[in-house]
Amino acid sequence: MTIRFVPDAQWFRSQKGNGVLAGSPLTYFGVTDAGSKILDAIESNADLPQNHSQLTDRLLATGAVHPAQSLEANSSDVTVVIPAFITDTQSHTNLENLIASLIGLAIVVVGDASPHPVHISGARVIRHDTNKGPAAARNTGIALVATKFVACVDADVSVTGEQLLTLAGYLADERVAMVAPRITSLNDKTFIGEFESLHSPLDLGSTPALVRPMSRVSYLPATVLVCNTNSLRTVGSFDESLRLGEDVDLVWRCTESGLWCRYVPAIECPHRARRSIRALLHQRFEYGSSAAALDHRHPHRASPLRAHALLLVAAMSILMGLLSVAVVFIALTILYFCWSLRSTKISMTSRTRLAWLGIVSTTKLLAQAIMRCWWPLFLLASLVSWRPGVMLTFSALVPSISGLMRFKPNHPIRYLLVRIISDMSYASGVWAGAIRTRSVRCLLPVITVRRSISH
């Protein structure tokens, strides 16, 4: 198969073509004339020149480019591990349907003390006498795997054997420890189904990525996670002491060990939505409660916000409604970025666009951090000053109304309420975890003062 790559969504060529600013975080690559031809080929999806590997390896390592496709792995090289907590006939039927879609692959089902009996043909079934959690269930199955690759698949997702083999094909590059597809949510025409199809925490979007903490895609859910078995065992598999966030922890340990993790949204696997608003809010709370434990293992990686100081001041001015102040800081930010990026030789238009995108992105991230972490503080502060109240109101309403206008849900009022309350539930979980671990570090932002673009 001809090797081809696709540029990252953040890709800015220099005016003379002898450099590119790309990836997440942004990295600048200065290239020779030969390197410029390689960049041209990547942009046009043409055959790559010979001796491209030195440059393309550097681009791959920073997420500036991504593999365009992969060859399917052999079915004999993949074992599927399914952690299962079966509670009723419907969840058992879902498991049977999942296994039927994986015919041709070795399958291990680990029943984690399921209250409903698990009777499955076409798979090896292991039973835990006590409920040990999904991390332990996966590890029990992984310990039995003798193949090169292992696919961890949750029982409430739909995925085919062909999709898993395609994902495993990305592991032909031994630097890649794991790869995950896009996890979409089944829209069953109920309100919950519709809401989850728009705002599922498992759906990481449509843009491929090299996964790293504090980047555009900073983690992978273990809903469907295809791994190099040796790499997985080298880093110690899943941490069984974590009932939540064990997949995030595993990805971060891999990246800290120098291994690559890839997100491949071209492959989509639908996931069943929660059955009620109460279950949805409980899920968000649980996810939030994992932040403190993750921060304990990976200091500052679970921060609610990472931002450049100048961008942050501009974003704060916008959310406070201080338009005249915001205009000044927006102008200063654009001037600063245009000046600091002068060595990249990208056009002034691209530099201005980058600065503007940074302002917009930071404003969105600040609003998200306020709602998903700091809203109790802003609520208390609003009793003393009206500015925090303005920021809290903007952070709650602007994203929700924007989503209402963009998606046009069938239940607009309920959509607005659940959109706001789900974020507040996540924040409540973050605070609960911080109190439980007696550490506030997971509540603190990471503010940088230097240019975050590397060369």
Label the predicted regions.
Residues 59, 248-300, 331-358:
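Catalytic donor/gating beta->alpha subdomain of glycosyltransferases that bind UDP-sugars
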Residues 315-432:
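Membrane-embedded multi-pass helical conduit in multi-pass membrane proteins
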Residues 127-145, 207-218, 223, 253:
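Glycine-rich, basic loop-to-helix element that forms the pyrophosphate-binding segment
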